[in-house]
């Protein structure tokens, strides 16, 4: 019975039907009906499309320029739903098209008057970082390797240019660094 119930619990949690009580230091965790734990939460306040519009506005605020594939990759939602919400935001004038993607209209107006140069930089971005998760659909196929894990993706001067592969045990054990540098 445990083998049948345990896989279903996270799915019920994602649907806001149950809540996992996580006390610090406790191994046993209780599962309770979501409505009993949070009676003030109104799960019908927003339609699915309205909720997606809110998510996409927040995503655009943090990402500045993005496309539907990035939002789908990050939120793990059906492309049809993402595109529908994006089209609604375009129609409402919240988003605007720019450089093959979308951005908040307010960001577009700010960038018209911004003339700064991006700084030269190298960042080792953890695979669970927001920028990595939203570009996962590209990065996974761009830097293949035979090692157990991709530990970090390398963001060099604002572009994805490599990955560090290996295994994370007590500390990261880097076995290989794959680079795609311009000549």
For each feature predicted by the language model, list its residue ranges:
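Long, charged, low-complexity, helical-prone intrinsically disordered regions
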Residues: 1-183
């Amino acid at each position: 019975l445990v083998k049948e119930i345990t896989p279903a619990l996270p799915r019920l949690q994602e649907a806001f039907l149950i809540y996992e009580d996580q006390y610090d230091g406790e191994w046993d965790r209780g599962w309770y009906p979501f409505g009993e734990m949070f009676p003030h939460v109104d799960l019908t306040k927003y339609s699915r499309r309205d909720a997606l519009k809110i998510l996409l506005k927040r995503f655009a605020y943090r990402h500045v320029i993005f496309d539907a594939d990035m939002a789908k990759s990050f939120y793990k939602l059906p492309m049809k739903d993402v595109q529908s919400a994006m089209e609604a935001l375009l129609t409402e004038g919240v988003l605007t098209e720019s450089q093959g993607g979308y951005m908040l209209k307010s960001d577009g107006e700010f960038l018209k008057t911004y003339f700064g140069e991006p700084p030269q930089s190298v960042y080792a971005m953890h695979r669970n970082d927001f920028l990595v998760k939203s570009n996962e659909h590209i990065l996974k196929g761009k830097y293949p390797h035979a090692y157990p894990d991709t530990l970090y993706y390398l963001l060099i001067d604002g572009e994805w240019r490599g990955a560090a592969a290996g295994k994370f045990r007590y500390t990261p054990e880097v076995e290989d660094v794959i680079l795609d540098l311009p000549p």
